[in-house]
């Protein structure tokens, strides 16, 4: 198969699968993207330019990796499937422009949730410059990865992530919607959320049961003032612990004293019978400020 045919095309993906006896591993949430328009759409959404430093999570057989490299990015990829490095080494272009592949691409066999980013990236990336994350995320670890990236101390320019459509809807949710919850609030206090692209489930091999969305997360320039982020996230989760109950009922565990609880609800300017999904992010921040950190 001529290598001028993109890895992400259905034809070349099938050739690679046959050549290396690849089987998508359900336990790793593997679904290979075979829609070249979607792949190029991800690269465009990530606004990739020559010289950009990109962390890719789960490169698979290299469908997205190839296009990131061709767009001029320097790519550091995390992968947990030890059967894939051989494929990436053989199938990715040997040269990108005038540079050999090893100057522009580095693969680390490691779970990104166990990554020490600064240690891993040292010597390959210029750590004084911002980093972009681009990934087709396995559905089963989407939320932990988003939290891990949001809470890391790396200087991120943006995170462009393909994920289950349902998760994307939770990320961009507004107060009053059923999708609004702890994930929404945790992410929106750190990042601007934009859904850039919808990807049909037919764009994957094997075909998942659900559609996907490509979401671009950009760090907020003016983040809300949260004194203790770990405490804030815990308070939000506690407020949503019994979603159908009123705010007053959910706060009983956090503020046993009824007078103090009533005073806080009055300060928030809300009805005690309001449910947590109707509160704004600013109101959750105020609740956390009034509950002592443990």
Curated annotation (Swiss-Prot):
HAMAP family cross-referenced by the UniProt entry: 16SrRNA_methyltr_A
Localisation per UniProt entry: Cytoplasm
The organism of origin for this protein: Lactobacillus helveticus (strain DPC 4571)
Keywords carried by this UniProt record: Cytoplasm, Methyltransferase, RNA-binding, rRNA processing, S-adenosyl-L-methionine, Transferase
Alphabetical list of PANTHER family matching this protein: DIMETHYLADENOSINE TRANSFERASE, DIMETHYLADENOSINE TRANSFERASE-RELATED
Protein name per the record: Ribosomal RNA small subunit methyltransferase A
Alphabetized SUPFAM superfamilies for the sequence: S-adenosyl-L-methionine-dependent methyltransferases (SSF53335)
Primary localization: cytoplasm
Signal sequence range: none
A single MF term (Gene Ontology): 16S rRNA (adenine(1518)-N(6)/adenine(1519)-N(6))-dimethyltransferase activity
Domain of life: Bacteria
Catalytic activity line of the entry: adenosine(1518)/adenosine(1519) in 16S rRNA + 4 S-adenosyl-L-methionine = N(6)-dimethyladenosine(1518)/N(6)-dimethyladenosine(1519) in 16S rRNA + 4 S-adenosyl-L-homocysteine + 4 H(+)
EC number(s) from the headed UniProt entry: 2.1.1.182
